[in-house]
Amino acid sequence: MKRILIVGAGGQIGTELVPHLQKHYGHDNVIAADLRDDMVAKMSQVAITEKLDILDINAFEAIVKKYDIDAIFNMVALLSATGEKNPELAWKINMGALMNSLTLAKEHKTALFTPSPIGAFGANTPHDNTPQDTVMRPNT
């Protein structure tokens, strides 16, 4: 049975992803992790939860080992509005989360899913019916 860790589970996508994956893999096989105490408390009503700062690779790895994780869903991201105001912080969080997820997925032979952030296309990219070969020029 797959054991899935969703990091950033308290975000917009994570809050929908947790119950969806629970339906397919069972309640006890989906672990929801988030940095924010309020989201961890809220999610603990409906899921197995862990508080996690994904930039702390040792804490991240401890959870992967504790639950014998087969798949990691990295939903952690600092979104465009904040990222454009503080690009260094966006880089630290978004790339740090990705790098730690890649490192642990490789070391523990887990599957990894990590989506592209919302601002990946940039301001000058067509917003409707965006062609597959569009040049991406993000602002962040």
Give residue spans per PLM region.
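N-terminal Rossmann NAD(P)H-binding glycine-rich loop of SDR-like oxidoreductase domains
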Residues: 4-24
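SDR active-site strand-loop-helix element
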Residues: 7, 33, 72-76, 112-118
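Conserved glycine-rich Rossmann-like NAD(P)H-binding loop of the short-chain dehydrogenase/reductase
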Residues: 25-37
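A hydrophobic alpha-helix adjacent to the NAD(P)-binding/active-site core of NAD(P)-dependent oxidoreductases
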Residues: 49, 90-91, 138
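NAD(P)H-binding glycine-rich loop region in Rossmannoid oxidoreductase-like domains
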Residues: 54-93
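NAD(P)-cofactor binding segment of oxidoreductase domains
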Residues: 72, 85-112
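Conserved Rossmann-fold NAD(P)-dependent oxidoreductase catalytic core, especially the SDR/UDP-sugar
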Residues: 99-137
